[in-house]
Amino acid sequence: MSKRQDYIVAWMEVRGKRFEILVRPELAFRYKEKGDVDLEDVLWTDTIYRDVRKGLKASPEEVKKAFGTSDPRRVAEKILKEGEIQLTEEQRRRLLEAKRRQIISYIARNAIDPTTGRPIPEARIEAALEEVRFPINLWRDAESQAVEAVRLIARVMPIRLARALLEVKIPPPHSGRAYQALMRMGEVKKADWLPDGSLKAELEIPAGAQVEVTSRIQALARGAAEVKVKKVA
């Protein structure tokens, strides 16, 4: 068996009995949160244990009685989704910090200061989160927590989630490849091809991403694009 830090224990109690599996920390966390990784990559081994520390394996009979199946993959999937993941303090600290950064990044990209209509710097959002003592949940997705955080932060600073509608005009020769590029930046609400070959479009984006998206559009058009904020709501 590998060094202890290479794996962690995920466990679940069923009918008074504890069942454990060995998993890779980062992938197990991601699997539990998003389910977008292969179970094979998450599992260190497909053995089902009663007690990993003692090396005590669960018998197929007691596994089937507890889970209705003795298939280790199906059992492991249930443990990961419904059970607990036993993190070390360092792993928990690192994952909490990563989640905190995701929340801050989401707010910075999607929120504005309603008194100015401008994006809010991440440092200011971070300070506000600390001020309101927002409790970060390791197992919940960043987006839903960010929405809750904005409600709390609004008590100590002007902030709201918003969408911005940009009016964009891109002249030839850059207009030909512009439409697909704009679709990757946001939601194209309207697009028209002008007689001179220019593309005129309305692009909806997260309000906090105005500077970033405008910069990307100008890079696409070699600085020749016209970008105006039509509405922030």
UniProtKB/Swiss-Prot annotation:
Transmembrane segments: none annotated. GO terms for biological process: cytosolic ribosome assembly. Pfam families: SBDS_C (PF20268), SBDS_domain_II (PF09377), SBDS_N (PF01172). It comes from the Archaea. Belongs to the SDO1/SBDS family. This is Ribosome maturation protein SDO1 homolog.
